């Protein structure tokens, strides 16, 4: 396998609205990110994935783009973007841009022209039909919106302000490739591709994900844009199996560097239920099965995976699967150790490295997220009690990840000097903040720093094979074999003591959140114990 820089990289996702505000308007901005690069350099990350900062009416917080080659005023301007790129590159940090090309904003010049002039070339940049079919929007309701002026319907798999692009139109594809090359020329390190598995859709057959021409489009995109540059690409692919992931990321296929697979995320809700019908606790045996499948079936050289617990669309893993009260620090370290010692490129979402938690939303006035608000409206119309709706939003709503970054004990957690922030700051910022984390050598931050450094330094993390070890249900233990070297990772994914009887005598500790000798002596794991050891030959 040809080694690439991203095999040893750890990537840090920034949600710009919530990272750091320097303008005093209560919303994070590009200058705020630049001001905190030294912090990220200390953490040790290789690259930042930047959620969208393009010009946008912000119907879906920037995932509705009205101009791909301009910066949203709320975040700054192109000079600020250039400054961020230069300052990051000086520190050896790459910037990965979010590429949102399944749809645009309805305020994009192409759609404005398409709507105003049904005979324009731009009309065919989007998907119009005389009659709607049964396709549903991911944000609830029909995926078709009537344009009263022409009497036709346009397709929007997300909000009605996010019309889907017609990827069958070669002119659209070329315009997208030109835009991608504009950003590559600026020196970015790659693209994270939003819902990229939807671009091959065939609406008339009600096929949305993994359409028949999807891989043709990606091969064409690769050749026309990033294929000749040392940049990384990761596709958001909700429906991916290991077999599909191989198609995307097998090097000789010349498509993407890696994918995000979301199979484990499905464990956040009850089987075959919507996300709002959340599971009360993590099914650890199911998690073991899913992670082990991806570790063993996406073989080295055949494709590449990403590793993540959190992103801007998901609740905080600490609150949904960890223990965000008495074992907050320990369970955060345990979940990090469990994930980061697998094969793949790990992604950290802002605040994860200090153990940020879900927000205690009281009522809908505190909620901003379009998906949560649509769910609340629909659920309450169907008789779901308001208390149950709020319980679901508190547990799995997207705003949990989007509350402002907690920098210090200062007002608004040091995020902003505004009177009010765009989303409320979690009241636990007095206990959970960057300043305290940096001052405490035993904090979650330093466990993440250690894991990031290990990945840069240790070839086995990239190349060793993976084998799940038989254990109690709530213990996740796996072994990685690299030539003569054997590494064993053991994590108690529970609040209860667990038996662990494997003989690891004489093993060398690589990383831990507990007293490994005591575990091996007593053959018991305390709640959320986690460690990695190298076995003696």
From Swiss-Prot:
Catalytic reaction equation(s): Hydrolysis of (1->6)-alpha-D-glucosidic linkages in (1->6)-alpha-D-glucans and derived oligosaccharides
Entry's localization field: Cytoplasm
Primary localization class, coarse: cytoplasm
Keywords noted in UniProt: Cytoplasm, Glycosidase, Hydrolase
Pfam families, per database record: Alpha-amylase (PF00128), DUF3459 (PF11941)
E.C. code: 3.2.1.70
Gene Ontology cellular-component annotations: cytoplasm
Active site: 194 (nucleophile), 236 (proton donor)
Coiled-coil regions, chain positions: none
The protein's name in its UniProt record: Glucan 1,6-alpha-glucosidase
Organism per entry: Streptococcus dysgalactiae subsp. equisimilis
Lineage, broadest ranks: Bacteria, Bacillati, Bacillota, Bacilli, Lactobacillales
